[in-house]
Regions:
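Bacterial N-terminal signal peptides that target proteins for export
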Residues: 1-10
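C-terminal motif of bacterial Sec signal peptides marking the signal peptidase cleavage site
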Residues: 18-21
């Protein structure tokens, strides 16, 4: 019995050596002998046709501003602190490009802060950002928030079903209306920017944030994403980023 087992082990080892030898012989080709593969990125990624066209005047102004900025000012524009970790004086000193309120963050750490409280904080931080007495910059800051199914961090705001429920409706037109209502309420609290829509396509229900996905069907997520962006920002040829709209950021994909 033991001889039989030993024979099988030896045979297996010999086969392994032979396979390795064959593989080594096949892999001796020089890198120079390998034919280069064509770049197929253009076939994989569709060509974008963006409705909001570039504005030459704006682009020129941006270039002018960038040419006068110090490295410290440029770095500050790429930093987004959370409202629990900055003060008005910090904003005046550093001139952060943006800031946010994460989950459980409220003006003055007050869960029951009123819309007026939110506006008051937004105004203080805005005025500090354009004060050039310390950082030499007058670039205005922006406030971003997670308003993914209504302005859900604010007491008294209109809340809608979460994304998984909205996806079950399979109604892009309804979702656009919801996004527009959300934009109005976000603007009413002095906030400029919403981190939505979420375009995660959930396929594994073990994920703890499955409810944030509209659907496991990419087609539904695609339709909804376009509707939410339009609802938040407005149509390119109509009220794009008017005083009833906010900036949208597609996220979590």
């Amino acid at each position: 019995m033991r001889k039989s087992i030993i024979a099988k082990v030896v045979t297996g080892a010999l086969v392994g050596v032979l396979v390795s030898a064959c593989s080594a012989e096949k892999n001796t080709a020089s890198v120079d002998d390998v034919e280069p593969q064509p770049n197929k990125a253009g076939e994989v990624w569709p060509k974008l046709d963006i409705e909001v066209k570039s504005n030459a005047t704006v682009e020129t102004k941006v270039e002018e501003i960038l040419s006068t900025m110090t490295i410290e000012q440029k770095i500050a524009q790429m930093i987004q602190p959370e409202i629990r970790n900055i003060t008005v004086e910090d904003m005046r000193k550093y001139g952060f490009g943006s800031y946010l309120n994460g989950g459980g963050a409220f003006p003055n750490n007050d869960k029951h802060a009123t819309p007026e409280d939110w506006v008051a904080l937004a105004e203080k931080l805005y005025q500090a950002s354009i004060d050039d007495s310390l950082d030499g910059s007058t670039i205005p800051t922006m406030w971003g928030t997670d308003a993914v199914h209504g302005h859900n961090n604010v007491i008294g705001a209109t809340l809608f079903p979460h994304n998984i429920g909205l996806g079950a409706a399979n109604n892009p037109e309804l979702v656009e209306k919801i996004a527009h209502i959300t934009a109005k309420e976000v603007m009413a609290t002095g906030i400029d920017w919403v981190f939505a829509p979420t375009v995660a396509v959930v396929r594994d229900d073990r994920w703890g944030r499955t409810y944030e996905s509209y659907s496991e069907d990419p087609a539904i997520v695609r339709e909804y994403a376009a509707s939410v962006v339009k609802g938040l920002q407005g149509a390119a040829d109509k009220d794009f980023l008017s005083d009833q709209r906010v900036i949208s950021t597609v996220k979590h994909f």
